[in-house]
Each structure stands twice: as C-alpha cells, then as structure tokens.
Amino acid sequence: MKISYSLLVHNETDTLEKLLEFLVKYKQPQDEIVILDDYSDDEKTKIILDYYSSAEGVVLKQRNLLGDFATQKNYLKNMCSGDYSFNLDADEIVTHWFMKDIHEILNGNEVDLIFVPRINTVEGITEQHIRGWGWQVNEKGWINYPDWQGRIFRNRPNIRWEKPVHEQLIGFQTYAHLPMEQKYSIIHPKTIDRQVKQNQKYSEILR
C-alpha cells in the first residue's frame, strides 16, 4: 500500500519545515509527499520547498489558490499516486506512533474515509475569544476536541472536495474513526494572531 501525504502551502515557514522534516523521516519508503504551493513569496518558505523538492518521494507543483480551497485540494488530490491520500495542513503534524501504525490501520479497515481526531490549541486565547467563537475548551486546553477531520481517504475519482472554505469530502461510501487518543490525533497548534488572521481570510473569501 502507498500513502500520499498531501499538503497545501502558502508562506508557512517554521511549521512547514518541521512537518516536512518529520514526514521525510517517518514515512514508509513507498509513500510520497505531495505539495501544492500557492506561489509562496516568503524567501524562507521558498528555500524550504526548494530543499525538500529534491528529496526522494517528494512531488512539488505550484498553482494559484484563487480563493477556492476545494478546487485547490482536488487538484492536489489528482497529483497523488497513492492508494490513500492523507491531507494535512502545513501548520499541523502527527505523532511518530501515528506514522508507525497508519499502514496497519488502513490494511485493517477497508473503508473509503477515515476520520482523525484533531487537537487544537491556541496560544494567547482568552475567555472573551472562547465565548465569542463559541468554542469548547477541555482541561488540557484542547479546543473542540475531538474535532473530527475527514483527512485519510481512498484515491478515487468519485471522492473529492467541495465548498471553497471549510471544505468537505464527498463521494465516499464507507468510513471509520480513529481512536480518540493523543497518539492518533492531528496536532494543530496556533497563536491567537494567526487564528485571527485566518478568520479574516475566510471571511473575505466568503464575501
């Protein structure tokens, strides 16, 4: 089995470098890392992408986002040659336990889509933010956990993304959920400044 770890990128720097270093280290030899860059103009990001584009199993292309995440992700999906695609944001990461077990999990679950729990944390968040956005925060500081994300899916033409923002997968018939455990969760840390900027960007796209 081959997994395509697929990433949309635009000017992420420290988080992108950490993610790519991690994926190159822990992916299986037959797996690939597929990157679609929205013409990043940050110099450090361009250096990171240039460096990792020459690594074994890495595929890199550029395409304008044009305010439509679903179309961009569908283009990215079509770049993938794996049996399954695992879509990650450039500011997310998983654990080495996750990478160690994912092939066995997929071999044991003949489903089209796997939902993955996500641990969201926002550095600098206040009670005002939490109330204003209607978030739930547990005793560990995890926001809206398990925040299920449909991210691991069969690479088939009928399974595709829809909606320009807060995009979702359609076309799948069967699905499963990973255990609600930290080792099987997507880790998604942010700062409050990044969260506010992201909210503003999504609002502009939806206008």
Where are each of the predicted segments found?
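Cell-envelope/extracellular polymer assembly enzymes that use nucleotide-activated donors
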Residues: 2-4
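Short beta-strand/turn micro-motifs composed of small residues
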Residues: 7-9, 37
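Short, well-formed alpha-helical segments that are part of the catalytic scaffolds
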Residues: 11-26
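A short acidic, amphipathic alpha-helical/loop segment
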Residues: 18-22, 47-48, 75, 100-102
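A conserved acidic beta->alpha catalytic loop
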Residues: 22, 33-48, 65, 89-92
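Conserved beta-strand segments of alpha/beta enzyme cores
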Residues: 32, 57-60, 176
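Conserved donor nucleotide-binding strand/loop of the catalytic core
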Residues: 46-71, 79
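Catalytic-site signature of metal-activated, phosphate-bearing donor transferases
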Residues: 70-77, 84, 93-207
